[in-house]
Amino acid sequence: MPVSRFAVFGHPIAHSLSPRIHTEFGRQMGVVLDYLAFDVAPDAFRVSLEHFVAEGGCGANVTLPLKEAAFEVCTTLSARARRAGAVNTLSRVDGVWHGENTDGTGLVRNLTERHGLDLRGRRALLLGAGGAARGVAPALLDAGITEMVIVNRSPERADMLCDALGEPGKVSARYWGDLGDLGNFELIINATSIGNTSDMRTFSLPRSLLDSMTAAVDLNYGSAAVPFLAWAHAVETRYAIDGLGMLVEQAAESFSLWHGRRPDTDPVYTVLHSEYGVPGRS
């Protein structure tokens, strides 16, 4: 039986659970596949993809900091990827790359189905405006978020994301220094890499951002999610959720695009959560 070759590209990538997740999905669904991880800097991404194709590669996941670079290599794009301006799933179709973004679908599915959150009518604060934020913002709006405020260390990138989303009545950009003046939010999403540079003693956000039902959600998992979720625990947000469930759900969406069948995510999530999950509240 021929082996289908897939991979995840990122920088760094040693921490990635994607090879393990897709191998487990393949075993569950009876699909024989080879799934590798490649640590590739942005300036080498296009060449690395060419080598991957030459060696039989037919699909790839893309993580930070390459999601916007992946958008640029695609000949065709899904509506979701085009709106996001970022790609996390590549499929080789008729000799060219087709780009999709499954991050937002994975996040919404994790929040609504696994954690039972109703996103309709919520006011959301999105921290970050890079590839991770771009991937989830459209799906959150589609899920019923009525107002989204985007805050980024570089305000120009927040403005660019607002423009790309094309919903000026719902989406606005503010400065990081304005956080204390924005009012409260039912949903606060960390789409930054601040967890890689902060610790539990230094990371903090204003308490004025919270109400009694605030859900604090980090798109990171493992140690990278600890500072943000430690803050969430300290201020007693109603929900504190890491990115592990989103990772598994977006992987299942990618698997379905490549193989035509969606695997059961619960068994994989349960095992990984016992090993890598950051304590939360849901």
UniProtKB/Swiss-Prot annotation:
Annotated NADP(+) binding lies at 128-132, 243
Q: Which GO terms describe its molecular function?
A: NADP binding; shikimate 3-dehydrogenase (NADP+) activity
Q: What is its EC number?
A: 1.1.1.25
Stretches assigned to coiled coil: none
What is one GO biological process annotated to this record? chorismate biosynthetic process
Q: What is this protein called?
A: Shikimate dehydrogenase (NADP(+))
List the Gene3D superfamilies hit by this protein, alphabetically.
Leucine Dehydrogenase, chain A, domain 1, NAD(P)-binding Rossmann-like Domain
Question: In what pathway does it function?
Answer: Metabolic intermediate biosynthesis; chorismate biosynthesis; chorismate from D-erythrose 4-phosphate and phosphoenolpyruvate: step 4/7
Q: Where does shikimate bind?
A: 16-18, 63, 88, 103
The UniProt keyword set, sorted, is: Amino-acid biosynthesis, Aromatic amino acid biosynthesis, NADP, Oxidoreductase
Organism listed in the record = Xylella fastidiosa (strain Temecula1 / ATCC 700964)
